[in-house]
């Protein structure tokens, strides 16, 4: 259940963040566990930049968790079941505190299923998606795997969700992967700077918007 954010990236980014004067400005943030859920064909190391910004702002490193799942082979339903077990384990290790979850791309669909179909909403204080194909993306017609089928507009997975399980969605008009871009909107929508799909993970202004959405 341990984190798998890359040590090299953490060290390098930390130096840059402190040089930029970010310091420990976020000490007043809630100290609940944060769980990061990657997108299709990704890994928790995709969140290295964001994790370092959290730790540089004073968030305890011990409260940051990365969830990995086999997005190339597993359906989003299967991944949601694994996520449910992971979240229960994290909560048990933290006095049964509620968690907040930050998910990128397809990871947001995995979390929504866990919230809407597996009872996960009760143990989650905040859920933030970054470029998630809530209503599907036409780019998913270019790949062939269970998760790709789930991400297609009008899929049985998206139809069964029927808009449930959303909370806060951050989306970019220049995403380039979620097509059309408005399909990344669900729940309370927050438009980011016009950055690409991957840059949602590393852009400083997007990180600041994520922080602003946390309770």
Language-model segments: what does each one mean?
Residues 2-15:
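Bacterial N-terminal signal peptides that target proteins for export
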Residues 28-30:
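Boundary at the C-terminal end of the N-terminal hydrophobic targeting segment
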Residues 148-215:
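C-terminal catalytic-base region of ester-bond hydrolases, centering on the histidine
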Residues 46-47, 78-79, 202, 206:
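Residues at alpha-helix caps and immediate loop-helix transition turns in enzyme cores, especially N-
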Residues 50-59:
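A short, Lys/Arg-enriched amphipathic alpha-helix followed by its capping loop at the start of a domain
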């Amino acid at each position: 259940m341990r984190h798998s954010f890359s040590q090299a990236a953490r060290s390098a980014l930390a130096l840059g963040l402190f040089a930029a004067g970010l310091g420990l400005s976020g000490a007043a943030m809630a100290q609940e566990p944060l769980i990061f859920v990657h997108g299709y064909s990704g890994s928790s190391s995709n969140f290295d930049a964001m994790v370092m910004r959290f730790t540089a702002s004073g968030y305890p490193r011990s409260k940051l968790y990365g969830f990995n799942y086999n997005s190339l082979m597993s359906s989003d339903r299967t991944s949601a079941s694994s996520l449910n077990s992971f979240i229960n384990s994290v909560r048990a290790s933290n006095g049964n505190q509620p968690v907040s979850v930050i998910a990128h791309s397809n990871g947001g669909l995995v979390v929504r299923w866990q919230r809407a179909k597996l009872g996960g909403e009760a143990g989650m204080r905040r859920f933030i998606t970054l470029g998630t194909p809530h209503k599907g993306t036409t780019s998913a017609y270019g790949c062939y795997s269970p998760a790709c089928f789930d991400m297609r507009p009008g899929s049985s997975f998206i139809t069964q969700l029927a808009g449930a399980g959303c909370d806060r969605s951050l989306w970019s008009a220049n995403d380039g992967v979620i097509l059309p871009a408005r399909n990344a909107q669900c729940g309370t929508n927050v438009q980011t700077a016009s950055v690409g799909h991957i840059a949602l993970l590393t852009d400083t202004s997007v990180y600041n918007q994520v922080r602003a959405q946390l309770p």
